[in-house]
Design a protein with these regions (language model features):
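C-terminal accessory/regulatory regions appended to core domains
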Residues: 1-166
Length: 166
């Protein structure tokens, strides 16, 4: 799988803005546009490149996918085992899921649970931000493992947040 940062000509950054991603996508799309090609083989190649450009932009626009791309690109060799989830975090996720289920028929309870999950999500987002920046600035086994763990926790809490909003 191609590095989406390389495809768009962007520096690898967790904090890349939507505006920067869209601007890079436009710039690359203009340069690779199939209408700029005259022969069928070049058009087909340009069409493939355009598809890769759009896929790279989509990947970078989603923070979880962007994080996965960074983790993939900075994966140590040999690849260490993925970190195990913290049992306390897993227990907390079970508690939140139970709270969501119990609050399913009461709007006030549902809102309270959603607010609690949103607060915990903000904390995990900050932790993920720090872990990803550390990985980019100091790519080592320890920072890679911390970034993978943070992304896994972020993914789990986002799922819980989506469930609480239903």
């Amino acid at each position: 799988m191609a590095d989406p940062f390389e495809v768009l000509g962007l520096p690898r950054s967790w904090r890349v803005s939507v505006e920067d991603i869209r601007a890079a996508q436009r710039k690359c799309s203009i340069a690779a546009h199939p209408d700029r090609q005259t022969d069928p083989a070049s058009r087909a190649n340009a069409l493939q490149l355009s598809s890769r450009i759009n896929a790279a932009a989509s990947e970078l626009l989603d923070p979880l996918s962007r994080g996965a791309a960074i983790v993939r690109a900075l994966e140590p060799t040999p690849k260490p085992p993925e970190p195990r989830q913290n049992p306390a975090f897993l227990m907390r996720m079970m508690e939140l899921r139970e709270a969501v289920d119990q609050a399913a028929h009461n709007a006030l309870d549902r809102n309270a649970v959603a607010t609690q999950i949103a607060q915990e999500l903000r904390v995990i987002e900050l932790e993920t931000d720090l872990a990803m920046v550390a990985l980019i600035t100091r790519p080592q086994v320890e920072t890679w493992s911390a970034a993978v763990d943070a992304l896994n926790r972020l993914r789990a809490l986002r799922r819980a947040h989506e469930e609480s909003a239903r």
